[in-house]
Amino acid sequence: MCVNATSKLTLHYINDPSTPNIKENVNLPVNNFMKLKVNNMTDVGGSVLGSVQWQADNAYISLTNCLNSLQKFFPSNIKKWAATNNLVVYPRAGKDANAYYDRSSLKFFYFNSYADGKLIYSVESSDIVTHELGHAILDAIRPDFWNAAAFEIGAFHESFGDLIALLNILQYDTVINTILIDTKGNLRQNNFVSELAEQFGSALEIPHGLRNAFNSESYVNPDFLPSDGKGLIKEIHSFSVVWTGAFYDIFVSIYEKLGKSKASLIQARDIVTKLLFESVTKVPATVKFFNSLAKCMIATDKKINGKLYSSILIDVFKKRNILTASDVQQMSLSNISILSEEKENYLFTSNKEIFVNSNNNKIKVQLACDSFHDNEKNKLNALSIFSDDIDSYQEAESFVNYLFSKDLIGNDKKHNWFIDKDNDNKLTRIKMQSDFGFINNCTIKGQPEYKKCWKPDNNSGCCPYGCPKTENEEPTNYKSCAVRYSGCNNNVTSSSCNNKIL
């Protein structure tokens, strides 16, 4: 790794402030790849721990090391960001429990912990920094995903960010050594690699990080999920864990197949990274995106690995309901074949748009359909998966309604999505934001509904958990009811609930 020979040693948190033992003292590395401008950064490093200069240097090290290590997996013609030549990084963008990518910058915020009031800086977590970088990387590779009106594509954008964070820390030898010692080689348990943004999660009173790649979540049609509450919901950050969990499962299964050694872990890491990048480059932007990407990964494994890991991929995707038994039976057919270079008429960048009516607005949206972004003309082989236009139209309308329900859409650029009145009311994404929309006031100290039970989607809101028989009775030690019910009554007991107070 190239370093700046004139720089001083800087303390670098490799993972997250919650794991301060996972650190290194290093010179500032040289960015060999896509350009970054980190505000408040020093020229030589060696800043005081906790200062904005140190935070900037620490973020620069994480970003640069991540880019340098992953560069070999990028399509060869990707040399710059999707919408800017120089990605600007703001270490202290303001006070908020947030961080986001907006096509020109990465912005990191700070806030007071809901647990103990301590000031939490999102920029100090390599997990958060490289997650946001992941959005920028995916946008550079697949800019056609940015405005696609499809819930699963949005959820995958979040998953990809988490996977970049995970794959990034697995580039460090000290991480690999420590995780193998901590887990005794058994990666099928909660660990500091699978847990993402642990300090941030603890500050929001969420155990095992904001999200955890080690999970058992399975695919459910997101239209059938509640929009709020605990567990899997129709919210892109929440739903992203389905794909992240499947990917982590595949990584661990390959690691186990190869022998559960340090060398096996490194080899498995590189195998799944290559599978991910190759597949993301080829996969069409379909409505049922998780299903399409799963098929693409299996086809890609056949092409680059001679089907060495296809049985693992199929088993995991079936277990997670991302692929059905029918999908598996048909996988020898052409619907998952890689199109040959001669059929480059299939390769195009999507700009197919329709108008949908939602929330008293007529809005122009970009459809998710059978689109491909041709990264390398005459070299990219796309995947021949096709979806029905009717599905694309219905998904566009459903997606816009989802955005309105989460207050993610507006007539000003303060929202995640902007209705451009000067351009036929075109719906345009402004930013990929870690807005934690699945957090509700029941779970946050200092909020009026704190420590009350979150009711399901058909009766959303908070009510006293356990529904005490009298107003003076102490509530039971349960936070989230798993069943749907019409209101609080004495029949709702702790046995109806599945999530104990943290």
What is each model feature region?
Residues 1-52:
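Non-catalytic architectural context of zinc metalloproteases
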Residues 52-126, 138-452, 479, 487-501:
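Zinc-dependent metallohydrolase catalytic domains
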Residues 129:
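A conserved beta-strand element that flanks and buttresses the S-adenosyl-L-methionine
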Residues 132:
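Walker B catalytic acidic pair
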Residues 450-463:
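Long, compositionally biased low-complexity repeat segments characteristic
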Residues 470-475:
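Extracellular/cell-surface secretome signature
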